[in-house]
Amino acid sequence: MAENKRVISIENRIPELKKYRKKKLVRHLAILIGIFVILIAITLYFLSPLSKLDKIAVSGNKQLTENEVRKESGLEIGEFVIGISNGKTEDALKKNTLIKDATVSKEGLNDVQINITEFKTIGYQQQDGKYYDVLESGIMLTDQPRQFPIGNDLLFQNFKNGKTLEKMVDQINKLPKDVVSSISEVIYSPTKSDKNHIKLYMNDGNQVSADISTFAEKMQHYPAIVAQLAKGQKGVIDIEVGSYFQSYYQQNAEKKATEEAAKEKKETNE
């Protein structure tokens, strides 16, 4: 009897086993079909124009042309969109001395938008009859000379790309706008005792003698210093150590007295 019951039990389970195997087979087939469909979709995507970069839009550029920005980005029309890294493209753009900041974003399925912020031109270096942009970053564009300066920005003289120019621009950037707009020219004129000496010609007719390292700290008081001068009085304001004013009249008188003394001494020796 026990053996008969066992045979009957196995026979009853056979349909269930077949049903389980069928479900398992269907599940495996579904997985395989799904993988196959995904592979086909991926293949079709990479074969379609949608997978490739179609358009590179540029905004925020003023000095750089759109084509120059595209070239700096390293992106090329027709390359696979999936391989484009926004971060790496932004880093590539920021290597350009004119670009202060850059953001890259994907638009739609296969377009890229590039937005840049350029360093502003704060003045021009006057050299050999040409003018070279001096940027707010402290860099001078030596490969892009102009015939004439644009607007009423500062004029620089005797500067070269390097730490001295960077320090000078950094000091200027710290000044209030009204003080900067009162400056006409900044001339680098180092002496034996002061390698950071500069001379400024002001729009109001005065001159300023200063040191680059303390320029912003002391030059911010220029309006107050000028306000204390007699009306119409012009001269040289020395802010290297403290603050000292010498009128052009005094300066010329001292120069004349020195020349006369030298002349008398020469005549006496003869």
Swiss-Prot record:
Q: How does it sit in the membrane?
A: Single-pass type II membrane protein
Mark the transmembrane ranges.
Answer: 29-49
Q: Which residues lie on this side of the membrane: Extracellular?
A: 50-270
The keyword Cell cycle is assigned to this record: yes
Q: Topology: which residues are Cytoplasmic?
A: 1-28
Q: Where is the POTRA domain?
A: 51-119
Where does the record say this protein resides?
Cell membrane
- The source's domain of life comes to Bacteria
Task: Alphabetically list the UniProt keywords.
Answer: Cell cycle, Cell division, Cell membrane, Membrane, Transmembrane, Transmembrane helix
Q: Which GO terms describe its cellular component?
A: cell division site; plasma membrane
**Gene Ontology biological-process entries:** FtsZ-dependent cytokinesis
Q: Which family does it belong to?
A: Belongs to the FtsQ/DivIB family. DivIB subfamily.
- Main function: Cell division protein that may be involved in stabilizing or promoting the assembly of the division complex.
Which protein, by its recorded name, is this?
Answer: Cell division protein DivIB
Provenance organism: Listeria monocytogenes serovar 1/2a (strain ATCC BAA-679 / EGD-e)
